[in-house]
Amino acid sequence: GVIVRVLYDDVGCWNVKKKFFDEMKESGVEVYAFLKVVFPIFSSKVNYRNHRKIVVIDGKVGFVGGMNIADRYVKGLVWGNWRDLHFKITGKGAQGLQSSFLIDWYVVSKNLITSRDYYPITPAYGESCIQIATSGPVGQWRTLLQAAIFSIANAKNYIYIQTPYFLPTEG
């Protein structure tokens, strides 16, 4: 069988019925809420959310972007189709997504997954470079800002940066 692991944001799924996740678990899916919040008013974890939308298949193919797991992303809404960016990454980039997911998985499950099976040898593709950069509110380094500045400084002809949270500092 295929091992399926799902992380979901507890605050982002506040209105999703428990039955939805229970059915996944009953089907053999390993499911965890990311930093479950029982009493939001008294919790220091309420602002430490996980907005990552990552799918990784066998450590070789990854998908990342803005799409959630919901019917509206496939069927659209009454007022029209949902539009979002989600893209496919293969090779070493997919393994970067795998690492990001497995670190988050460890945070909530305490199950450290380091098997080489999750990081297969992948051939190099073309001359493109990809770096998966992650960040969160508890880190002291501004990882995404540093990655953007480094990428801009080292670009030869052009650069594409996509983020829903581009809030540059003043100055």
Language-model regions: role of each:
Residues 2-171:
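Charged, low-complexity intrinsically disordered terminal segments
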